[in-house]
Each structure stands twice: as C-alpha cells, then as structure tokens.
Amino acid sequence: MSEGLLAPISPQPIPDMVFDRISRAIIGGKLQPGQRLNVLAVAEEMGVSQTSVREAFLRLERHGLLVKFPRRATLVRTWNRTDLMEIASLRASLEGLAARLACANLTAEDSAALSATIAEMEAAVRREDHDALIELDLAFHRQIWAIADHRLLEQTLDGMKLRTRLFMTIVRGYDVVDYPSQHRQLLDALRSGDAEIAEQCAISHVVEPAELALEAMPDQEGLVAAAVALRTQAGY
C-alpha cells in the first residue's frame, strides 16, 4: 500500500476510529475498488493493533465496503450496475416515504434549517469542495428523516449511510453545480404541503443522478433495461 493514504492514529488504537478512517478512504477514492488490503500492512501504517484492524475490516464487510475471499486477501469492493440499482431503488423508496411524512410535519423552523443547509451547499460549490457537498447532501436528508418522525425509517436510512455516501461518490459525475437547486426543489416540494409531490420529488432526486451514473458505466449492454428496472423498483 502506498504511503500516506491512512494517517497514524495516536495514542491508543481505537477500532471505531480505524473503521472511520478506512471507510472515508474508500468513499473518498483514496482506496480504489479491487485494491487489496492487508491487516498487518494497514495496522503498521495506521499505528494500531492488528486486532483493531480486523474488527474494522469485519464491520466494513458488513457495510458492503470490503469483501473477503476464503484464504485470500481482503479487497475493496468493486461496485457494478446491479449494486448501484439496488442502492438507488431502495434509497429512493425510503427517501420518498420520508419526504411524504416530513411534508405533514414541516415547521417554519424546520424549513429555515433546511434552507440554511442549502446555503452551505452553495458555498461548497463556490469552493469546489465536493467532499463537503456529499456531507451536506447527507446532512440535508438526515434533517428530513428527523422531521418525518418515523424512528424505524430513520434507523433504516441511517444504517445505509455508508452505502449512501458511496452512492454519492459514484454519481459525482452529476453536475455538482446543480446540487443546491436540486435540494431547493425538494424543499419547495415539502413546503407545498402536497405529500404526493414531495414523495415523487424525493424519488426523482435519487433516481435521476443514478441513471446518469448507469450511463457512464462500462458495458452498455442492457442499459435501457437497467434504467427501466431502476425506475420500476423505485416506484418512479
């Protein structure tokens, strides 16, 4: 592994911090799909115990960011069209439900908080800070989850947050200049008080960039079928 990808952790090895550092390196593209990770090498580079790294690897496997083959090295997972469709369709359905519920609960204070997050997105666009945009995108949606006031839905979406961050990284070819306006449209839909409009806007907010990402993937065979399947699965 090349030097400097994962900064040392001090003074004590903390499995949660190891997990966070590695997941951020994967999502940020510092660790590439298919790249081999070795427990000993990672432990030495990060300055932590092998036990901490093994624990982090197991959690990352459960979250779908790493894959381990029997008697072989652990690899950063390579994502294909099916993976993207599954993430997008599930997230679109859940985000649609969250928007539908949030529409009925939205207060003036909630609206102002969401608008403030969009303003931060606009500042991130001016700085050309895509990493900040991904975090702000997720923050915006987490605000909606909270407003929806559906504990199990929020827990389910929160459990997908690493896959959601990775999804956002995969679709980063989508015009980031449009990020604030896309979120403004979703906020306007919530403010409309029309649950159907809010739900469909939230679904399209996920599906449309996913379709662009599908188009950019190699092997165009079955692309139309994949796009149709995505819309069908998402109820779009």
Describe the function of each predicted region.
Residues 26, 102, 125, 190-193:
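Hydrophobic residues in alpha-helical segments
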Residues 45, 174-236:
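C-terminal regulatory/effector modules of DNA-binding transcriptional regulators
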Residues 13, 111-112, 174-178:
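Short helix-capping and inter-helix turn/linker motifs at the boundaries of alpha-helical repeat units
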Residues 1-100, 104, 109, 214-236:
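Short linear motifs at protein or domain termini
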Residues 87, 108-169, 181-188, 197-207:
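Conserved amphipathic alpha-helical segments that form helical-bundle/coiled-coil interaction surfaces
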